[in-house]
């Protein structure tokens, strides 16, 4: 289990096309994004068939994963159809491996990915997404780094058919796609550990290419034969490579337990198949897993220390030639496979001694696969000595000690104490482990050596494993009959939570293997105790950190075989020079035949002396196996060379807390007086060091043991910060002195003086910024005559310590330490020198140390007689040897591709170096200045970058494409501009202070250093800068004189946007706003907060007058506006970025870009603290100019893209040839529905609008004359899709879908927004329905529409109504008669009566009755009255 890290993953779901829906009907799609236990759901889009647009973004910036988990991490996009009363329907999914994205140059991918369905092999559409994945220290990609998609530029706006999104095309594979079937076969699992419920219920799952397959489930067993094959259809290219195999234990009424997980590389599987082989599973014990997770969460790295079983797997990839051969993912039965060839094997072990273990008794266990055996329990020498002397505690006292031990155990205290535990022949003999193992060494079990302790008085409840070691079976030596081996010391690894046990224990033992079934085990080898002298040459230490917050008072202790010696204590220094040879008289077991000793682990521990006692800082464990003896006649004496060793400290002994320069030497005690010690004093050259200090910036001082609370400082919470006022900075400059053994006078004190003694009118300013940070001008130069070792391995260091007034621990602010190796004038090869002084982990990792030959200039180039040499060191750890072999194999494999072509030698020599780098590129690094980047030319440490003076340009179509031009007509840099300015003479170097195990940046110091030898100019330093910076008067005139800068300047800050902001809680949407700090002035733009967005667009220009040096520190803060529960403000501080304006003003490169009005745009990271994690990125640039000439410098009109509003009017005239026969009907009740998907739509009209119904159309023709309006479409928009769909109307139930057409309207909107001229287009558009399309049916009808695009201002002056409502104009729409009559409505309902044949007789009858009525009224009625 590797240490956990914080990763950032973000994505944008753009759109989906050509979705395959059930029965071809429109659905309500959404996208569900899953990643590392997180889930995000997009908005549901309604009634979509083929094209769906989302444009939704989300970011997770707090994914806490180990290295192994990151290797297998995926982000999965599932397109689902939402259902109201049952489970959503899966339309398609795609997975992307995050590790592959993180390895890309821009850490992101933007692509249309094919959607797959687990039940078949067809492509179910495509999903266009943008995904980025960043490891710790990597900033999210800037918008300029996105992979721009090529789009055609349509200039014809009259033909609406060109805006149709063609979703009727057949979804095809990418060009160059290859088809595969991947077969992963799980044959058998064995030796699964028992759980709390007893036997296991195991099953196996396999995940790849968006599919997850599961085997059958076994019941109540720890070994089971599956013989099942997982088949996956794979089409390359594929955005994932890892095939995940997981072994689970089924649980009833709770989550299944994951036993083990493994991965197979698909790319390797394509080159060669994996024949069935055993994979051994290793993990952690159930009782230790909680502690292991805790340690990993705090940055610790753990090694699996328990055998959890094994699985027999086979895999292969089969290439297919036809797409018809591709079959869906499925689990099928596999033919049983014979077990790989096996051989008998026995593991033999004898334990001689255990050293450095706490507890009363110890026992050593050998664990190999399913077999394990232990030694007997042995009591330590201290307990035995107490028993023999009669001072052992009586029964009552022992009971009291036991009670105290139980209390310590319950409190969780770590047991302390060390003891030696010798084993005799009987106690140390481990029972033979007789096994049957695979013949292939890679499939054989590892051997786990565990150390168990017991002892209630020591705080151990029961048998407790405190340390272990895992060894490969192939590294175990073979057993030779009647020839016992000499024992060796095996270093152990502490188990959680015993990492803080002083040194890790070690075991002196013999472990062998025998492949003979019948053998006679001989007695273990007899070894005798012989006296030796261990000489530990402790030269120096560097970069030491004290958890107390003050400067450490360090000393080094070297311990071996129960003997220890210490150096003297050095006070208040982080880079002490000890120059001390510690002599340890030790007794070690020696083989009487070979006369070679068994060297016990050598523990080098760094402590600091405090007033209350001794505090642990760091430790390194060295394993040494060389013996220095007398010289033979004619043999030249051996020379020695020290090496820098890493020290590990912290709560779990996993943090790098400094380095120590060390050399070890072992000789026989009888030869100690004959063999002299190596001379430690190196050959030195006297040099002159010039230290020019400009001043200190942004200083903070807190209580000694209190951390600096940056967030509370930004919030102005003075009580929580507990800051102390800084009245007068004091600088202590010291340089390592090897000639005087660290006791020389290579140091100087610089005090802040407000007025110069020689000129009281000259004032050095001391001021405070708005964030309570102290700043001061020093302007002092000190010249020091120092001794510099000729050999750079000693790494002389310059240390700057800053105090407040007094040089006492409670006034300590921080320190800065730098190596002088890049400044040494006679060092010729800086690359090799820096590699030589880089620390190694410890001697266990040092299989082959590299010599420093060729580093020195002139007569020192090849002479090692005047300096030191090196004793080769070799590790005893089998794991380290294996790592070295693997590294060597990798080097040879890579070197095969780097072949030399002699034919190109003449041409390449003209402009290439032997390393392959262009000469002009390397020469550009020779810019004067000592803080230069060294070019590493080996294949593992290549760090070449393009300097600021180089311009890269593109040719061809991409260069002419307007999308590649900078949006704001200026260059840009991918990070901060300071990293690209190489002429800054006084850069800001961080002052650091260790508090409570963490490091705070407490300020910055600005200085210049020059190192000369024999008064010759230093080739690594700018000679022109050294001339004026070496004098206080010239430096003051250059930086504070009348011509240095105008009395009043003006700053312009252009902030475009922020990217991927994170407030620390996924449930909170930020409302970002900007806050500007300049000196003691602060301006907030809280009133302009952008609501509910992680990617706000500010488009803000901020101007302010600047007076140097008071306003030289500029800080841009980003906050999130929130209201508290009680009604007050409860804003959240997101992060800030700081710029030193003084550096930029005095940079000639920056002034040149400013004069051309081409200041680069920056993507500056936002952090809550200088050493914290990224909280986002801000896109901005800064201009600085003379106040009087500010009017001559044009101000860039930084405005957000004009929020032009456009209105869309859709007029549906009618339709023809609607294919209603596909619905099984003889007529159609036609209806047209429009749906707008647009990110910028802000209108009040509904997104979905529909026409009235044209009833009872037997020809498929329909007339509507219907207007739909979408007002207030705010520009710009990323996409705008209008869906026009035809339906067969149903008054009850869902209306059947006939066909649709989708239009991309973005370019029409952009044209109207830029020209403010309306666009009116007419077209007859073809309707499509992919689900019902066949060879006989290719057309589903046509719809006649008119689209009007009008600026909102014009549309407001000429409003229109929806449908045919008033105002009805432009054009006037009439109500059609067709399809609206009663007979049409009744005919649609099936109630239509055809009365046309009876119409003639109805009219005749009516005439007759009318005539009779007239006759009666005219003649009969008057006569009756008369």
UniProtKB/Swiss-Prot annotation:
Gene Ontology annotations for the cellular component aspect, listed alphabetically: cytoplasmic vesicle; inner membrane pellicle complex; membrane; rhoptry
PROSITE patterns documented for this protein: C2
Superkingdom in the source lineage: Eukaryota
Effect of disrupting the coding gene: Conditional knockdown results in inability of parasites to form plaques in plaque assays after 7 and 14 days due to invasion defects. Impaired rhoptry secretion. No observable changes in the morphology or growth rate of intracellularly replicating parasites. No significant effect on the localization, morphology and apical anchoring of the rhoptries.
Matching SUPFAM superfamilies: C2 domain (Calcium/lipid-binding domain, CaLB)
Name of the protein: Ferlin 2
Membrane topology: Single-pass membrane protein
One GO BP: regulated exocytosis
